[in-house]
């Protein structure tokens, strides 16, 4: 059917642009001599994860255990869970995940001795060995052990405990992904992790603690890590390329990132025009995430979106500008793809104005 036959608000992706973005990032990562482990919290759909794997990705990332369960049920067999877990229920779910999918590989990120002890206890009871990756603080001041003795002791604890194994380190600087300016962003991304790689060379390697995997990076910072020591990149948003990432600049343009094309859109409808300079559409905060800024109205110059609450979006434009009428459809480019996907049940794939397929967003709401 034609895209204009969709009920609004609806979430859709330009399938050709998305596929081009997938291929482009894979080639860029290959050219850097790294491997790509895309973060699927961006899309939350096993079928799209499989497209990324088919293009050359070596595995995937998920943010939460719930997303891992969705991806494993969808047939994905190499999954890194990038957020630490705590509590017996979560740990037992991790064990059950291994038991339910014995042919799959799961790596759990941790940053505390508690994780080692509790996961090892549950894994040993189930006759399993769980692979662990240690998160290292890399500037974001979120999770992560400090580089130094604490890191050495945590690695030693894993290496000396049955039921778990040490596979590597995660150093993800999420706070730098949207730094504007290609050179500035890359300089900051490298400088914040240089102490880690110096420590690996000076301390971890001589003690037999060399990480097999060093994972991190994102759509904004992946290019900074060539030759630094990372083995895999966790970029995710590149396949949709939301408005926030478009604004960070690239190697040729200081204000616009043209490495990838904006593919994710929201289709909305004009429902009211109270004044000549104010138009209201049916896309509010329940469908458009605004944590990274306001969405962009596609194809119409001089129009500014303002949230009007849960179900309303307000478009501001010059008075007397006859550009909208009631019932007209408007396309918006979301500012943050990850959280916008979490507002919808369905993602429609569109090609040349036609809906060619649709996916259930299976990982929606799976922050558990």
Predicted ranges, named:
Residues 131, 137-250, 254:
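Active-site loop/helix belt of alpha/beta enzymes
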Residues 18, 41, 71, 134, ...:
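Conserved, mostly hydrophobic/aromatic
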Residues 39-178:
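Active-site-proximal beta-alpha core segment in soluble small-molecule metabolic enzymes
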Residues 188, 220-300:
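Active-site loop ensemble at the mouth of alpha/beta enzyme cores that anchors a bound cofactor
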Residues 34-35, 205-213, 341-344:
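Flexible, glycine/charged-enriched surface loops at secondary-structure junctions
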Residues 17-48, 61-63:
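N-terminal glycine-rich anion-binding loops that anchor highly charged ligand groups
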Residues 273-368:
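C-terminal accessory subdomain/extension
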Residues 1-13:
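Generic N-terminal amphipathic, Lys/Arg-enriched alpha-helix
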């Amino acid at each position: 059917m034609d895209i204009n036959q969709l009920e609004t608000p609806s979430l859709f992706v330009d399938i050709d642009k998305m596929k081009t973005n997938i291929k482009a990032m894979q080639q860029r990562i290959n050219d850097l001599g790294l491997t790509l482990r895309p973060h699927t919290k961006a899309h939350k759909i096993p079928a799209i994860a499989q497209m990324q794997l088919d293009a050359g990705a070596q595995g995937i990332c998920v943010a939460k255990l719930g997303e891992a369960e969705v991806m494993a049920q969808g047939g994905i067999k190499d999954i890194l869970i990038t957020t630490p877990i705590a509590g017996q229920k979560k740990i037992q779910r991790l064990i059950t995940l291994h038991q339910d999918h014995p042919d799959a590989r799961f790596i759990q990120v941790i940053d505390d001795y508690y994780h080692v002890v509790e996961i090892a206890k549950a894994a040993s009871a189930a006759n399993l060995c769980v692979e662990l990756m240690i998160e290292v603080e890399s500037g974001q001041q979120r999770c992560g052990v400090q580089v130094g003795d604490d890191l050495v002791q945590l690695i030693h604890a894993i290496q000396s405990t049955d039921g778990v194994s040490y596979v590597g380190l995660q150093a993800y600087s999420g706070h730098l992904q949207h730094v504007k300016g290609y050179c500035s962003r890359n300089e900051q991304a490298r400088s914040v992790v240089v102490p880690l790689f110096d420590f690996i060379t000076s301390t971890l390697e001589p003690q037999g603690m060399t990480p097999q995997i060093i994972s991190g990076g994102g759509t904004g910072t992946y290019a900074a890590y060539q030759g630094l020591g990372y083995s895999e990149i966790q970029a995710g948003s590149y396949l949709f390329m939301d408005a926030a990432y478009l604004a960070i600049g690239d190697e040729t343009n200081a204000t616009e990132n043209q490495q990838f094309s904006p593919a994710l859109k929201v289709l909305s409808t004009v429902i009211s025009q109270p004044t000549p300079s104010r138009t209201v559409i049916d896309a509010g905060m329940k469908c458009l995430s605004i944590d990274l800024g306001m969405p962009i109205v596609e194809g119409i110059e001089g129009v500014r979106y303002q949230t009007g609450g849960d179900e309303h979006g307000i478009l501001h434009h010059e008075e007397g500008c006859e550009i909208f009428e009631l019932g007209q459809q408007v396309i918006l480019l979301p500012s943050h793809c990850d959280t916008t996907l979490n507002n919808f049940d369905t993602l429609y794939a569109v090609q040349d104005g036609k809906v060619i397929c649709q996916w259930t967003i299976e990982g929606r709401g799976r922050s558990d």
